């Protein structure tokens, strides 16, 4: 089987060397080129024919965003992973890059001076993401059948479509910012129930994402804070590095931010939120799993279904990565599997 070909683009020689060394440890990866600038990268792409590009966000002359724009003019489907700093500017630039067509991103370690820690930090983020795009390339020629509805699903769906839903809980990862925009901007200001969201992102990034979505949508979107009271027609996104759960105090439902251990290597984790809403709202929950890598949300959807709630998942064709929604669908937990552009309409229909 041919090796997976990668082009590294970063103005730092140290970073290029670290990434090159990490990738060279894997016998299924071939680093076919390195480039210190966007200009050189654009010239190299047709020469080395990469399967994936790792692209630094901040570079002199032509920065990562401009380089990405030019890549997308010619190479619509070539996967690009952005390499970004965990700063306000880095978060904004990364969200811009995802809007412009970047497939995913990784964040730079806070201290590049500690070489061993920096290497391990980058390795843990980067290799799993590359594996996903490698597997995706291999599977593109395979015909995938949508999982069929199980008897468990048919029974539950029929019983509960008449139950009044009281909350929407959304879990999403890779491809999430664009998916959330495409979903949330279709909800009217009069949306009847609260929305709580887990998007796998680090601190600062979740703050900027909430601000951006709130400016683009008819409903307010907040980064969740401890003891926030949730309200109908508003959305809350879990802050980076914190799980969120919901607790009832009298007639109010509040958010709790907690730092219990990561689940599925994630904090915030979809499973933590979904278990919480299933326990609190029982059958009055609509869980929605959008594009994302891994299986976070699978156990949470099991909890939602066991308590009598409903689950929708994004389909494979419209997902950047059909990991999280695919796991839920293949486990027979989804009431419906829908393209992203049909999900908002179905959510509104079910909420009533």
Swiss-Prot record:
Record note on modification: Phosphorylated by CheA. Phosphorylation of the N-terminal regulatory domain activates the methylesterase activity.
PROSITE patterns attached to this UniProt entry: CHEB, RESPONSE_REGULATORY
Keywords in alphabetical order: Chemotaxis, Cytoplasm, Hydrolase, Phosphoprotein
Domain named Response regulatory: residues: 5-123
Compartments, as annotated in UniProt: Cytoplasm
Gene3D superfamilies attached to this UniProt entry: 3.40.50.2300, Methylesterase CheB, C-terminal domain
Active site: 173, 200, 296
GO molecular function: phosphorelay response regulator activity; protein-glutamate methylesterase activity; protein-glutamine glutaminase activity
Reactions mediated catalytically: [protein]-L-glutamate 5-O-methyl ester + H2O = L-glutamyl-[protein] + methanol + H(+); L-glutaminyl-[protein] + H2O = L-glutamyl-[protein] + NH4(+)
Domain CheB-type methylesterase residue range list: 166-352
Gene Ontology cellular component list: cytoplasm
Residues carrying 4-aspartylphosphate: 56
Pfam families according to UniProt: CheB_methylest (PF01339), Response_reg (PF00072)
GO biological process, one term: chemotaxis
Enzyme nomenclature, EC number: 3.1.1.61, 3.5.1.44
InterPro entries: CheB-like, CheB_C, CheY-like_superfamily, Sig_transdc_resp-reg_Me-estase, Sig_transdc_resp-reg_receiver
Domain characteristics, as noted in the entry: Contains a C-terminal catalytic domain, and an N-terminal region which modulates catalytic activity.
UniProt function note: Involved in chemotaxis. Part of a chemotaxis signal transduction system that modulates chemotaxis in response to various stimuli. Catalyzes the demethylation of specific methylglutamate residues introduced into the chemoreceptors (methyl-accepting chemotaxis proteins or MCP) by CheR. Also mediates the irreversible deamidation of specific glutamine residues to glutamic acid.
Family (UniProt): Belongs to the CheB family.
Protein name: Protein-glutamate methylesterase/protein-glutamine glutaminase
Species this chain originates from: Trichodesmium erythraeum (strain IMS101)
Lineage: Bacteria, Bacillati, Cyanobacteriota, Cyanophyceae, Oscillatoriophycideae
The encoding gene: cheB
């Amino acid at each position: 089987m041919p090796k997976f070909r990668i082009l590294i683009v970063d103005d730092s020689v140290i970073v290029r060397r670290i990434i090159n060394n990490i990738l060279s440890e894997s016998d299924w990866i071939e680093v076919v080129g390195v480039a210190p600038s966007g200009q050189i990268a654009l010239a190299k792409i047709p020469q080395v024919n990469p399967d994936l590009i790792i692209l630094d966000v901040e570079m002199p002359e032509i920065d990562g965003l401009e380089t990405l724009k030019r890549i997308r003019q010619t190479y619509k489907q070539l996967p690009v992973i952005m390499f970004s700093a965990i700063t306000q500017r880095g978060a904004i630039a990364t969200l811009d890059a995802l809007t412009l067509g970047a497939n995913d991103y990784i964040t730079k370690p806070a201290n590049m001076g500690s070489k061993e820690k920096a290497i391990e930090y980058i390795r843990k983020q980067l290799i799993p993401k590359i594996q996903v795009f490698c597997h995706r390339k291999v599977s593109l020629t395979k015909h995938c059948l949508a999982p069929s509805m199980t008897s468990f699903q048919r029974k539950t769906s029929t019983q509960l479509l008449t139950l009044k839903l009281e909350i929407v809980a959304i879990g999403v990862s890779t491809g999430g910012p664009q998916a959330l925009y495409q979903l949330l901007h279709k909800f009217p200001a009069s949306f009847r129930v609260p929305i709580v969201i887990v998007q796998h992102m680090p601190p600062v990034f979740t703050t900027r994402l909430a601000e951006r979505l709130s400016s683009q949508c008819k409903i307010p979107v907040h980064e969740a804070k401890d003891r926030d009271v949730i309200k109908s027609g508003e959305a809350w996104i879990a802050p980076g590095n914190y799980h969120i759960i919901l607790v009832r105090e009298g007639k109010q439902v509040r958010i709790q931010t907690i730092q219990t251990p990561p689940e599925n290597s994630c904090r915030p984790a979809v499973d933590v939120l979904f278990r919480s809403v299933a326990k609190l709202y029982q059958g009055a929950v609509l869980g929605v799993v959008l594009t994302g890598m891994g299986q976070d949300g699978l156990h949470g959807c099991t909890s939602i279904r066991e308590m009598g709630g409903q689950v929708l998942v994004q389909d494979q064709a419209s997902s950047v990565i059909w990991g999280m929604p695919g796991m839920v669908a293949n486990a027979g937990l989804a009431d419906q599997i829908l393209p992203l552009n049909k999900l908002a309409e179905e959510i509104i229909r079910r909420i009533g």
